[in-house]
Every structure is written in structure tokens, then in C-alpha cells.
Regions:
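Extended, largely alpha-helical regulatory/partner-binding modules appended to the mid-to-C-terminal parts
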Residues: 1-154
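Acidic, low-complexity intrinsically disordered tails
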Residues: 148-166
């Protein structure tokens, strides 16, 4: 239709780009450990024509922004993000630490390499997100949750005073 106005969603679909708001929500679901919402949103993005490599590069960019937020406080104006997206990042990054973000960064880089050898990029993306969720869930397992009590570390073992009997 020559009279049809091209929308930003049309351009994103043609280029295989994801809506940043949806990506921020997806990362938030991963951080929350919500597999169902994560996979449903991924499927929605794939149905919209998502390109796996673009997705992972956008994911890296957002991890960087989450890390910047975690280390330096609220993000000031950013040319590539709307005010609503900045608010979403602010809200979603409340309890994040650099250790998690660094692990997510490394796994994202590895998955970009994996895309070169897998036959189904969509399955690779789904497995990538599930790995992130389970990695985060493992991180959240404290000794008390796993063992029912805090484990004693060598430094915490009470030391008996040894007196010299000379």
C-alpha cells in the first residue's frame, strides 16, 4: 500500500530489532527468575522478527546500562533511551550487583559465539535466557536456604586457647 505510513514497529521488524522497553522488561523477568514471562516475551519478540545477534548486542548494551546504574547511581539523560525506558532501568536495577551482571555479560558474549554453530538461533536464545535465570537462582541460594542453617567457615570455628605449660 503506497499510502501506508511506516511505523517504528515496521522498521524494527524489517531490521530484526527489538523494542527496548520489551528488552528491559525481559531482563527484569530474568532478574526476577520468572521463566514463564521471560519465555513468553521472547516468543513475542521472535514472532515480531527478532534477529538473534541484534538481540544479544542490545542485551549487552542494557547490561552495561544496568551496571552503570548499579555503580554510579541514576542514569542522567541518554540519547538512545526514552524517559520511560530510563525509569524502567531505574526500577529494575534496584537489587543488582556487578558480580551477577559480569556473569550475564560473559554468558551473553559466549552465546553470540554459539550462534555461529547452532542450527536454531531461537532455541539458542531460549536456552541462553533459561541459563541466566538458573544462574541467578543459584546465586540467590544462601547456605541457610540450601542446608537449613548457616555453614561454618574455618575462620568462624571457635578456637581454643592453647596455653604454654612451661
Amino acid at each position: 500500500n503506497p499510502n501506508k505510513i511506516i511505523e517504528d514497529t515496521d522498521v524494527r521488524q524489517m531490521l530484526g530489532l527489538a523494542d527496548k522497553t520489551k528488552l528491559i522488561n525481559l531482563i527484569s523477568y530474568v532478574f526476577q527468575g520468572d521463566e514463564k514471562k521471560t519465555i513468553n516475551l521472547l516468543e513475542d519478540l521472535i514472532d515480531s522478527g527478532l534477529d538473534a545477534k541484534n538481540f544479544l548486542n542490545d542485551f549487552l548494551e542494557l547490561l552495561y546500562l544496568f551496571g552503570r546504574r548499579a555503580n554510579l547511581g541514576p542514569i542522567e539523560k541518554d540519547m538512545f533511551l526514552s524517559e520511560a525506558e530510563l525509569e524502567l532501568i531505574e526500577k529494575s536495577s534496584q537489587n543488582l550487583n556487578m558480580q551477577d551482571l559480569s556473569l550475564f555479560w560473559q554468558l551473553t558474549l559466549k552465546t553470540i559465539e554459539d550462534l555461529k554453530i547452532v542450527s536454531s538461533e531461537n532455541i539458542a536464545l531460549e536456552m541462553f535466557l533459561l541459563q541466566l535465570i538458573h544462574l541467578k537462582n543459584l546465586e540467590d541460594l544462601s547456605d541457610e536456604k540450601v542446608f537449613g542453617h548457616k555453614q561454618i567457615i574455618n575462620d568462624e570455628i571457635p578456637k581454643k586457647k592453647i596455653e604454654n605449660e612451661n
